[in-house]
Structure formats: C-alpha cells, structure tokens
Amino acid sequence: MSTSSLGAVGVSTATAPSAGATGAPAARAHAVEVATLWRPSAPCTPRTCVDATGPARAVPLAALRLVAVLFLLIAGFVASPLGGRIPSRLIRRWCRWVVRASGVRVRIDGGAAPDGGLLLVANHVSWLDIPLLAAVRPARMLAKSEIRDWPVAGWLTARSGALFIDRDRIRALPDTVARIAEALRAGEAVTVFPEGSTWCGRAQGYFRRAAFQAALDAEVPVQPVRLHYRLAGGAPSTAAAFVGDDSLLTSVWRVTRSRDLVAEAEVREPMAPGSRPDRRSLARAAEEFVLVGTHRAEDAGPRNTVPFPAGGGSRATEQASAAPAREALTA
C-alpha cells in the first residue's frame, strides 16, 4: 500500500487548455496535451533493490506483530465513524499504533511544521511514510483514485479526507490542483509525494511540479521533509521499501521481521510563500532539500534526533543513528 503522492507532474503548458479549465488560477496554469497519460513509475523492484539481510526477529514474534498490524487496520475500519471525516487526532494516534505494532522505531529531526495551510512534500519509499509524516503534522493525503477500491485501506484513506487523483485522466489534473489549493486556503495541511511513485531509497526520482502550483495559488508555505530508513547501527536499509510488484502483505511481513529498523523524518526549513517565482523553481528547491540531501545524509554520522511523540507535549532529544518503487499510493 505504499501510501503516496500526487506525483506532482510538470505538464507542458505549450498546448491549449482542456475544456472547462479556464476558471481557477491553478486550472489556467495546467494546459495539457490530450493524448498524454501521466503514470509515473520507478525501476525499483523487490528482487533488485530490497535487501532485508539485517537483524531479523524470530518468526513467532514477527507473526504476532503482523497480526497486530492487520488487527489495527481492521479495527480502524470498524471503529471509524459512519459519517464525515475521521478527526486528525484519532488518525495520528492510530498511525502511531500501527508503527509501534510493526516494531519500527521512529525519530523526528528538526523543528515543528507551521500551523495553518501547508503543503508537505517528501520522498516516497514505503507505506510507513504516511504514519511517519503524521508525526510531523496530520494532513490530508493526495492519493491515486484506485486506492478507493482497496479493501479496508481504501475506506480509511477516503474517510481520512484524502484528495484523489485519476491518473488516467490528465485533463482532471487542473481540477485536482484546484482542490488542493482550496484545502490549503482553508488552513489545512496536504501531503504530497512529488516523485509520484515509491523508490527504494538507493535510487530516487525527481519532483513533479503540479502540486507546487497549488501552494503558489493558495499562498501557503511548502514544508520539505526528508525520510530515511536505517538500522539502529546507522547503516541504510531498504527493508521498508514498498516497490515494484511487492504486495502489501509481503512488505508488512518484511518490516515486522526486520529487527532494529529505524524510520527517520528530517523536517527541513519551510519555504515561505513568495520565496520562489513559479512552480518549477519551487519544485526544484524542494527537491534539493529532500532528494539531494538524502544522499548526503546517508554518508553522515549520528545526529541529534527526537523520539516519535507519544501524545502532545514536549519531545526530549536523544542520540540516534542517521538514516537512507512501486506506484505511489497517492498518485
């Protein structure tokens, strides 16, 4: 289920806009070619990229953790209210339980994300990215429309307030960007994975631009977040990667079998409204913060991080090791 992205796409603006796409600023900014299909993908596969040779848990304990994760998925489905969106505080708590049940240690490095309308952008590696980013700030996700048809997870994704994109209908992209901008203007946070697909962490894509137009139109900050998965000793790990033809069950099992797996989110400086003149430069700057910096971080030694917050309140610092596709869950 790699939870993912709007792979924000840089659509050519040289052609005429699609019908009905002339109203909102975001719509006017996204003229598209009729025949173009946008389906970002990554060359990563479980066989070529995923290495789960680190310390492993005993099978019985891993099986218990797998059952716990599946139980939480089902419990979230059963316990969710019948009408309306699930409150963000409940989503954050539920995400925290899922991560803990999987046996992954989480560390957050950097300052708090701003309040109010905010576009969160991050590199995309795993289904764990979503609960990891919920620790930074609960947000509405941009998800590919196919997710709605997934059992349990599709229901929960829709009920969390996710914004969906139909990746087979590129004419719908301007409307998607406009809906993101509307949510941002309403003071909500929206999370996007601009690579548009999950990558193993050793290789990476590039940031597509469309979602950044929404931040420009809504005049809100962009919050880059760099995600890494490492072993407790500091070595990068691809065990959490959810790529290629990997199934969700296989990926969850690999994670629950992995011992000493650490997920890290590095919260970079927010990019203020108006700090970049257009979506191209904004996407490029965010990519520099997230993707280029990820490779640098893999060569870095230990750094100060803070533990995954258990509830509200302060976060005490502690020393921890630094850390390092399948179609994205969010388009």
Feature locations, PLM:
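A transmembrane-helix-recognition feature enriched in membrane-embedded lipid enzymes
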Residues: R47-R107, W155-S160
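Membrane-embedded segments
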Residues: P131-R179, E188
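Soluble, non-transmembrane catalytic domains of enzymes that act on hydrophobic metabolites at membranes
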Residues: M1-V50, R105-G111, I130, I165, ...
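Catalytic-site beta-strand/loop segments enriched in glycine and acidic/polar residues
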Residues: A183-A211
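Glycine-rich active-site/cofactor-binding loop and its immediate structural neighborhood
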Residues: G116-V125, D129-V136
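A cross-family acyltransferase "interaction/gating" segment
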Residues: V152-G154, G201-P277, A285, A297-A300, ...
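Generic beta-sheet signal
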Residues: G116-A122, A162, E188-P194
